[in-house]
UniProtKB/Swiss-Prot annotation:
This is Squamosa promoter-binding protein-like 15. The keyword Zinc-finger applies. The keyword Repressor does not apply. Probable transcription factor required for the flowering response to vernalization in the shoot apical meristem (SAM). Defines the competence of shoot meristems to flower in response to vernalization in perennials. A motif (Bipartite nuclear localization signal) lies at residues 121-137.
Amino acid sequence: MELLKGSGLNQTESGGSSSTESSSLSGGLRFGQKIYFEDGSGSGSGSSKNRVHNTGRKSLTARCQVEGCRMDLTNAKSYYSRHKVCCIHSKSSKVIVSGLPQRFCQQCSRFHLLSEFDLEKRSCRRRLACHNERRRKPQATTSLLSSRYARTAPSLYGNANSAMIRSVLGDPTAWATARSAMRWSGPERESHQVMNVFSSHGSSSFTTTCPEMMMNNNGTDSSCALSLLSNTNPNQQLQQHQLQTPTNVWRPSSGFNPVIADRVTMAQPPPVSIHNQYLNNQTWEFTTGEKSNLQYMSPVLGPSQISQPADFQISNGSTMGGFELSHHQQVLRQYMEPENTRAYDSSPQHFNWSL
């Protein structure tokens, strides 16, 4: 009996499982672990997915945001589709957007109120101001140039030359200032600016003397002596120079100083023309040996001035002989020849000074 009961239970269980399998297969066919449904249900699910995709496309379509336009910008340029404005309304002076009269700014790429625009301008006032500031930067080249000249000219050249430079730069009142500064109103000034190069005890040196113009014949002031690379005291040099300078020297009233030597003094004749005023005023002084025999000669003496008789005096009052005088004149003539205009040759030692 129990076996029969157990078999009956097994049959009922198998029948229940078969009924569940049949109910599960009623919706579709089962092959292995996959269940395939009918075409009607499958087509319904596919159409619902396509419907959702189409609605998403419709919502992403770019259109012009101007009221009354709503133009489709799908096939337009990316600029217009990105900013949602058509080509016509992007250049219009007045459109209605969100119920307000506005205008499209081509630099901001946005719509602004009409009060933010200037007349006949396609960009807003704020963008135009920034654009003008970038374009119209102040050029500081002229100001830097003028400040540099104003800073360096007085320190390097002095008052007269700085006035000349200012006259060149365009200052109309600078030329009168330069002319007034060039005039010397003080007493007679005869400053021999002596420059000794490689000077030492017992060695040869080259000294150049550049006397200045004399405006009055009141006195002398030789306080402008400059010595380079020398170990001697400038005050001692000044005293020696004053002792060696003779008193009976011809001083012309035209403003030219005579050529003064250590032992020999040659009175320089007055110049022929005013054009050679500064050229005749320069002299060259050569010192050779330990005895420091100074020889003065002018680098710009012409043949007519050399042929004129020159008065040679010695500090003790005696006069040089004719032979020595002719010898000095020959040296001057050789110096003024074309082949010897660029150098000077002395007999004891050879000096080649390029002028």
